[in-house]
Amino acid sequence: MSLSSKLTVQDLELKDKRVFIRVDFNVPLDGKKITSNQRIVAALPTIKYVLEHNPRYVVLASHLGRPNGERNEKYSLAPVAEELQSLLGKPVTFLNDCVGSEVDSAVKASAPGSVILLENLRYHIEEEGSRKVDGQKVKASAEDVAKFRKELCSLADVYINDAFGTAHRAHSSMVGFDLPQRAAGFLLTKELQYFGKALENPTRPFLAILGGAKVADKIQLIDNLLDKVDSIIIGGGMAFTFKKVLENAEIGDSIFDKAGAEIVPKLMEKAKAKGVEVVLPVDFVIADAFSADANTKIVSDKEGIPAGWQGLDNGPESRKLFAATIAKAKTIVWNGPPGVFEFEKFASGTKAMLDEVVKSSTSGNTVIIGGGDTATVAKKYGVTDKISHVSTGGGASLELLEGKELPGVAFLSEKN
């Protein structure tokens, strides 16, 4: 699946067309109040571009939260409609459902150039294809799923996907539109361009920075990246499993991943065969408890971590080592912070690493931050706009980096 050959919104003839855009309006809510409108703002360029090209109307659809295939007012998109209306500066019609005869009539009767937001797609079991009942998975029937998809599809001539955060899910709104033109919006196109360049044609040296607790969770990621990168920094909790297996280091009460430990030698063999440099921390900030106000000290890997203590961040020597590795790279993909940045005492390693990748990005290199915790870090320290690309999809970006095909991307039309 080439990421750079997909049809984009700019390839479409939009005049007088009925346009359906799958957006990601899965915003955080406090009751009915939106606490961050970032995802709505991110969709505006695509919506505005379509409106400038005089469509018959624009239908927007999204999920919000996990209503488990049934109506739940807690997850209504009504507050999003209000916020979108004020951001767009034009009326947004909010409909009480996403399929059914009332939706069909309202959409068809809308004035030319209207913007219509449908209610939460996940109110229907047919969107995800299943729901949980008493802890058991209950599947939607194939007939019901086909009917749901057909009803959504009947609202449109053209389908645009701008929801990268859900691109790794084969949900109805991601893969159910039997239309000749299925294009990526600006947000999705940007994701595909950055990941496509890094994974298909990177400017070298190419560095991957990986954090996270368990090696076992990251095996596929490390294995796939070893085929592509020139060097890897391994930080976070999983560094302790590598240190223990490779150097028999004393790791005290730090995270040790038994299942992952069995795979470490194989991964290192592959790294050696591919000529990939693997960089591990050489000192640690350790704590006598996993808590924000724990007692702390710095130890080198030679000293080891004593029993009763655990490593929660890398130390000053590791920061220097990582900085030197980052300084050599021309393309950097970062997925997972190197320490427990949520606690101030253990945030220095993450902050130092962030400073180095910002330096790299502002000097013209390509730096991609995978979504999830690492994107949270960039946001926390206010540097999102100083990084080449901060991904909007944690799970989706991880699966891309693991070498998996994303159903929502594979489903898009190819450029002619």
UniProtKB/Swiss-Prot annotation:
Keyword field: ATP-binding, Cytoplasm, Glycolysis, Kinase, Magnesium, Metal-binding, Mitochondrion, Nucleotide-binding, Transferase
Protein name per the record: Phosphoglycerate kinase
Catalytic activity: (2R)-3-phosphoglycerate + ATP = (2R)-3-phospho-glyceroyl phosphate + ADP
Family under the similarity heading: Belongs to the phosphoglycerate kinase family.
A molecular-function term among this protein's GO annotations: phosphoglycerate kinase activity
Name of the top EC class for this enzyme: transferase
Entry cofactors: Mg(2+)
Binding site for AMP: 213-214, 218, 237, 311, 342
Binding-site residues, Mg(2+): 213, 216-217, 373
Enzyme Commission number, as recorded: 2.7.2.3
Subunit structure: Monomer.
UniProt pathway: Carbohydrate degradation; glycolysis; pyruvate from D-glyceraldehyde 3-phosphate: step 2/5
Binding site for (2R)-3-phosphoglycerate: 23-26, 38-39, 62-63, 65-66, 121-122, 168-169
Gene3D superfamilies membership: Phosphoglycerate kinase, N-terminal domain
HAMAP family attached to this UniProt entry: Phosphoglyc_kinase (MF_00145)
Broad class of the protein's primary localization: cytoplasm
Residues annotated as binding CDP: 212, 217, 236, 336, 341
Taxonomic source organism: Candida glabrata (strain ATCC 2001 / BCRC 20586 / JCM 3761 / NBRC 0622 / NRRL Y-65 / CBS 138)
Cellular location(s): Cytoplasm; Mitochondrion
GO CC terms: cell surface; cytosol; extracellular region; fungal biofilm matrix; mitochondrion
Positions bound to ADP: 212, 236, 341
Coiled-coil segments: none
